[in-house]
Amino acid sequence: MTQTQKTILVIEDDRDISSTIQSVLSAAGYRVLTAHNGQDGRRLIQGQKPDLVLTDMMMPRMGGFPVLEFLAELPDAPPVIMMTANEGSRHKAYAEMLGVVDYLRKPFAMEVMLESVARAIAAAAAGPKDQPEA
């Protein structure tokens, strides 16, 4: 691979899910960072500048929405994929309003996650998504 290795931050409180996602992403050639709550995730976003964030919605200490709100304030925020078992359409709408590029409902196939990750990274590499309107 001649492409620079992309860094993905996985924010997930369920350690089994986090470990599985980390293994799958690492095997696909990504560098993976993990956090088990939103507070630790925010610190890693600030310190490590990941290329993509995968975050759970419901976590102790700080959930996914405060992470999204934090990212919305950053000028160079990475794209975000939200992972959740929540079926609520209002949650999905709010996540999309905050800029989530994909919304994966648990349980999801790892192949689906890998496709979502590849799309998000390709879209980010293609350039800014919010071009000024004429």
Where is each model-derived feature located?
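Receiver (REC) domain active-site loop signature in two-component systems and cognate sites
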Residues: M59
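Active-site beta3 strand of CheY-like receiver
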Residues: Q48-L54
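Acidic catalytic/metal-coordinating carboxylates
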Residues: H36-D40, M62-P66
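Short amphipathic alpha-helix used as the core "switch/output" element in two-component signaling
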Residues: R43, F65-D76
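Charged docking surfaces used in two-component/phosphorelay signaling
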Residues: S19-A27
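Alpha4 helix (beta4-alpha4-beta5 surface) of REC/receiver domains from two-component response regulators
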Residues: P66, E87-D102, E115, R119
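Short hydrophobic/Thr-rich beta-strand motif most characteristic of the beta2 strand and flanking loop
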Residues: G29-H36, L44
